């Protein structure tokens, strides 16, 4: 009976070790994917900001030239 208990514990241990290793690798991959997503959204935010700044500058120049021409 003691032999069966030891065998069962050994089997459970050998099953849990690879499982925990797989979970750790999965967490690392998820963290890498999240970091990549954050980097991409940061780039998109930069592009949108640049577009808004350019559009604002163009509108400012247009309004300035229109109001300057009426005087």
UniProtKB/Swiss-Prot annotation:
Transmembrane segments: none annotated. Residues 23-42, 70-71 form a propeptide. It is found in: Secreted; Target cell membrane. It comes from Agalychnis dacnicolor. Expressed by the skin glands. Residues 30-40 have a biased composition (Acidic residues). Its main location: secreted. This is Plasticin-DA1. One of its GO terms (cellular component) is membrane. Residues 1-22 form the signal peptide. Neutral peptide with no antimicrobial activity. Does not permeate bacterial membranes. May act in synergy with cationic peptides by enhancing their activity. Has a moderate hemolytic activity. It interacts with zwitterionic phospholipids (DMPC) without perturbing either the interface or inside of the bilayer, whereas it causes little perturbations at the interface peptide-anionic vesicles (DMPG) as well as in the bilayer alkyl chains. One of its GO terms (biological process) is defense response. Plasticins have huge conformational plasticity. They can display random coil, alpha-helical, beta-sheet or beta-harpin structures.
